[in-house]
Amino acid sequence: MAELWTSIGAAPAEKQEQPPKPRDVILVKSPALLSSTSSSDLHPLKKIRTDDKCLKPKRVNGEGGGGNSKGGPGHSSSVTWSFPQGASSSSSSLCLGNPGKTEKPTKPREKRDKEKKRRREGGGEENGEVKTAGIPCLPAASPVTAVRNEIKIKDKEKQKEKKKHKLMNEIKKENGEVKLLQKGTNEKPRPNAEDLQIKKVKKKKKKKHKEGEKRKHPKMHSKSIQTICSGLVSDAENNQFKEAKVEKDVYFMGLLGKTEVKKVKVEKEIPFVSLKEPRVEHKLKCLDSLEFKHLIHIEHQPNGGASLIHAYSSELSQLSPVEMERFSEEFVTLVFSENENCAAFYVMGIVHGAATYLPDFLDYFSFNFPNSPVKMEILGKKDIETTTISNFHAQVKRTYSHGTYRAGAMRQISLVGAVDEEVGDYFPEFLDMLETSPFLKRTLPWGTCSSLQLKSRKESDDGPIMWVRPGEQMIPVADMPKSPFKRKRTTNEIKNLQYLPRASEPREMLFEDRTRAHADHIGQGFERETTAAVGVLKAVHCVEWNENPRITKDVICFHAEDFLEVVQRLQLDLHEPPLSQCVQWVDDAKLNQLRREGIRYARIQLYDDDIYFIPRNVVHQFKTVSAVCSLAWHIRLKMYHPESAATQNSDNLEETESGKETKADIERRDKTLYSSSTYTCNVQFKDPKQKPPQIKHEQTYPLQTSEECGNINLPTISPAPTECHTFETKTDYTTDTPVKNEMESTLELINQDFADRHVTPKDTRQHILTNSVIRTEEENMC
C-alpha cells in the first residue's frame, strides 16, 4: 500500500515534465501475438516514440490520448507505452489516474463501449481496475473498425451456413431425397395441406351433385312435401294430393271441435293412400269402406317410416264361417293393394295365430312319413348329410332346450313332388289341411286369387316348400363336431411367449342363422320378374309348450316404392337365388344410413303360428331367433298378370261357345228330322182316301209324332219334288177344308215350339222361311 500511495503522490511532479500518456488498452491476444508476449516477458520493451503522422492513437471507451490535445479522435498523439513486469501495478494505476482531463463521449458511443465490454473474453475487471499484467499496451482499435469487423464476421458465418446448406442439398439430391422442380412456364408451387383439404371437399361436393342429378328430385323427409318431392308422381296428381290433404286437415279439425262421435259414411270411391306421410289408423280413409275395419290394425313405424297390417285370430274367432270368408277376401286385397306406380302400400300383412289348427310339422311328417329323405346340414361345416326325417327329428329332440336345438338345419323339401335333384314328395292330405284356412285357400299357388289354372297341384313350380332352422346361437367349441378351430403348434419359442390362449383360441362360435336381403322372383332370364310370397311359421317345441307364442323371426322389409334404390344401395344381384342375392347383412347402422337417404323400412317380429303375406317388390331379410319350421311359396296374383287372366277368360268363352255349338248341332239334326217329317206328312196328303181321325191323332200329340219320325230311318227327299207333290195334291183335294185348317194349326204350333226352345236364331230363320213359304203357297193354292 505504501508503494501505491508514493506512486500517486509522485504523479503530479512527473506531469510537468512528461507529455500526457494514453490509457492502457487490453487487447485480445491472437495466436500471432502469443509468442511476442512471451518474449516481452523475458526482455522488457523500451518506450518507442513515433511521429504523429505514422500511427493514429486507438480510442478505448470513447476517450483519446492526452488532455491537452484539442484535435479530433483520430489526431491525438500516438505513443505506445510498455512497462516492465514489476511495475505493472503502478503503471496501471498511473494510466487510470487522469480521468479529469478527458472529454465526455456521446451517448451512443457509451452504449457501444458497454456492448464491447460484454463481448470481451481475455481481460477481467475487478473494482473498476483493468488487469494489464504481462500484456503490452498496444494502440486500441477505433469503434468503427470494430463494428465493421463484427459485420464481416457475421457475413462470414452466414456464408458458411449457406455453404453448409448447399452441401446438404447436394448430398440429398445425390441420394434422391429431394425432388427437383422443373423450371419453366408450367412450374407450379407445391400445394399445402389446406389446399389439399379444399380440393377433397370440392370433389365430394361434385360427387354428391352427380348423385343428385341421377335422382330427378332429392327425397325430402318433411311431412308436408315428402310425397311431392319423390319424383314419382306427376304435377297434376300432386295438385290433387295437395287439395285432398287440405280437405283432410279441415275435416279432422272439425272432428276435434265436436264432442259427439258420429259415424263415418262409407265412401263409394277409395281415395289414394300415401304411406310417405306418417298416419294413424283412424286417418286412413280407405278403411272406412271396409266391412271389417275394426278387426284390421295398421302399424306405422316411426323409425323406418313403413307400414304393415295386423290381424289377430282371437278377434276373428267371433266371426261366422261366411263372415270369415268375407274378411279373408278384404284382408288379402288390402295387403296386396298398390298405388298407380305398382308399389304396394304395406310391406307385410300378418294374421297372428291363424295356423293354430295345423299340427306340428315335424311331428306330423316324422310320424306319417318316417322314411321320407331329407338333406341335413352339419354345424360348423358346409357339408350336407342325407338322412330320413325321423332320424332328423330324433336329433332335434335330443339337442332341444328352451327354444333352440344344437343340430344342423334341414334343407328345403317340396310338398308337391320332387323334380330332378329336388327332395320331397307329393303330400295331398297335408295340402288339403292347408286349404281349409280361408286365407291360404285364396293365396296358394293354385288358389282363387292366383292367375294360374293348374290341372293338378303337382304341376306347381312355386311351392309350397318346407324347411327347419335351429335358431341363431353361440355354440361352445367343445360341442362342435370336429372343431375347425384347432391351434397350430409351432417350434418358435418367441411366438410361444406371445401366445395367449384366451385371445387367440375361441372358446365358442357364433352360429349365424340368417337369410340376407332378397326379393322373391319367378321365371328365368328376361322373363324373370318379382312376385308375392306367403309363409306359415310353426315353432319347434319338442314337448315344451308355452301359453304365449314364441318369437321365431326378426324381419326387415323395405318399402316397395324404394325397390330400385334398395337394389342399388345393397348391390343386389336379382338373377341369383334368394340366399346369394345380397353379400352384406343389413344391421342398425346400415338401416340408419339408408333412412337418411329416404329409404323406408319396417322392423317386424314374427311369432309362432303366424301367417304372413309379402307383396311384390318388397326386399326383405330374415333372422331366425328360435327353432322354427317354415312353409313358404310364391303366388302369381291376377292383378300382377292381367294378360294371363284375359287369356283364361277367352278360353272359358271358347269352351262355352263350343258347348253352344254342340247343342246347335244337335238341334240342327233334330230340325232336319222334323222338316223331313213335315214333308212326309205333306206327301201323305197325296192319297185322297186318307182319314182325318189319323190327322187328329197327330194333332193331339205333336211331340210324340216328331219323336216317332225321328226314330224312323226315312229316305232323303229333295224339297223340289215334294213341293210339286203338294201342288198336285192340293189342287186335287180342295173340298176338305176342315182338314186343311187342322194341318195349318198343327204346323204353327210345332214351329213355335222349336223356335222357342231348341233351334238357334240363324237356323230358325232359315227353317221358318221355308215353312212359311209352304204355308203361303198352300193358302194361295186353296
Swiss-Prot record:
2-oxoglutarate binds at T515, Y612. Residues 1-223, 645-669 are annotated as: Disordered. Residues 62-74 have a biased composition (Gly residues). GO terms for cellular component: nucleus. Its EC number is 1.14.11.-. It comes from the Eukaryota. It is found in: Nucleus. One of its GO terms (molecular function) is metal ion binding. Residues 199-222 have a biased composition (Basic residues). Keywords: Dioxygenase, Iron, Metal-binding, Nucleus, Oxidoreductase. Residues 14-26, 101-113, 149-160, 167-177, 185-198, 657-669 have a biased composition (Basic and acidic residues). Binds 1 Fe(2+) ion per subunit. Its cofactor is Fe(2+). Belongs to the round spermatid basic protein 1 family. This is Lysine-specific demethylase RSBN1L. It comes from Xenopus tropicalis. The gene is rsbn1l.
